[in-house]
Amino acid sequence: MTEPLRIVFAGTPEFAAEHLKALLDSPHQIVAVYTQPDRPAGRGQKLMPSPVKQLALQHDVPVMQPPTLRDPAAQAELAALQPDLMVVVAYGLILPQVVLDIPRLGCINSHASLLPRWRGAAPIQRAVQAGDAESGVTVMRMEAGLDTGPMLLKAVTPITAQDTGGTLHDRLAELGPPAVLQAIAGLADGTLVGEVQDDSLANYAHKLNKDEARLDWTRPADELERLVRAFNPWPICHSTLNEETLKVLAADLAEGQGAPGTILGASKDGLIVACGQNALRLTRLQLPGGKPLNFTDLFNSRREKFAIGTVLGQ
C-alpha cells in the first residue's frame, strides 16, 4: 500500500458525511474539513451546523467555513495545509482554478449520477423523475467546469419502480465512499487514468424548487407518479383540496379517465384522481396540521372530504 495521504475534505450534507466517515476510518490523514457556513433551520431558525461539520468536530478535525473560496486569504489558508489531495462531495461552493491547483494530486469529486448524464445540483431526484433505469456515483477529477472533469471510477445501481429520491440517495451514499477510497488508491500509485466525458451526452440536473412540486393534473399519470417519488422526502408534491393544501407522499398508477384533477373513486386502497392521461391512485397523504397518513386511515376518518367529482388543484 502507498503512504497515507494528507487529505482536505469539502462537503456539507448527509451524503457528504457518509464519505467523510469512510475517510476518517481509512489510514489517510484528514488535515481539515471545509463545509458551508451554519444555516438557520427549524421553527426557531437557530443556526445549525452541517452534518459534515458535526462529524468533523466529533473527531477533532479542524473545520473551515469560508463563505467563498475566491478570497485570497481563504486560498492561502488552504495552501498552508499542504494537502496531497482534496476530496469534494456536495460542498456547494465553486472551487476556482487556483484552489484546484493547490493539492499535489489535485481535487476529486464524488457525484451522484452516471456522468455525463445529470451534471448539476439535483442528479438523484432528476434521475427518478426522468424514469432512468439506473443511477450511480461517478468519481471524477475536478476542473473549472461544472461536473465536467475526467471520470475515474463509476459505481452503478438500478433504479426500481419503488425508489424515491430518499431511497436512491441512501443507496448512493453507500456506493460512493468505497469508490472514493478506490480512486484515491489508484491516484496515489499512479495506476488510475481518467476517461474524458462526452459532452454530447451531458444534461443538467437543475436545482429543485417548491413550485415544481405542485401537481399539474393535465400531465400524464406516469409522469406525475415519478414526480411524487422523486420529490420525496423533499420538497414533497402537493395539490389543493377544497382550498386546503394536500401533500402527496406516495402514489401509483390506476385506470380511469376524466377531467384532470377530478376524484374518480375513493376506497381503502387509495384516492383515484384523473390525469391528462390515465389516472393516479394517491396512497399516502398529509392534510394541513396533520401527520402523513396512509389513505386507508384517512378514508376511515375523513371520508366526506374525498367525494367523487371533487376537483383537486382548484
Curated annotation (Swiss-Prot):
PROSITE patterns per UniProt: GART
Name of the molecule in the record: Methionyl-tRNA formyltransferase
Lineage of producing organism: Bacteria, Pseudomonadati, Pseudomonadota, Gammaproteobacteria, Pseudomonadales
Enzyme class name: transferase
Top-level taxon in the UniProt lineage: Bacteria
EC number in record: 2.1.2.9
GO cellular component: cytosol
UniProt keyword terms in alphabetical order: Protein biosynthesis, Transferase
Family: Belongs to the Fmt family.
One Gene Ontology MF term: methionyl-tRNA formyltransferase activity
InterPro entries: Fmt, Formyl_trans_C, Formyl_trans_C_sf, Formyl_transf_N, Formyl_transf_N_sf, Formyl_transferase-like_C_sf, GART_AS, Met-tRNA-FMT_C
Task of the protein: Attaches a formyl group to the free amino group of methionyl-tRNA(fMet). The formyl group appears to play a dual role in the initiator identity of N-formylmethionyl-tRNA by promoting its recognition by IF2 and preventing the misappropriation of this tRNA by the elongation apparatus.
Designated gene of the protein: fmt
Binding residues for (6S)-5,6,7,8-tetrahydrofolate: S113, L114, L115, P116
One Pfam family named in its UniProt record: Formyl_trans_C
Catalytic activity: L-methionyl-tRNA(fMet) + (6R)-10-formyltetrahydrofolate = N-formyl-L-methionyl-tRNA(fMet) + (6S)-5,6,7,8-tetrahydrofolate + H(+)
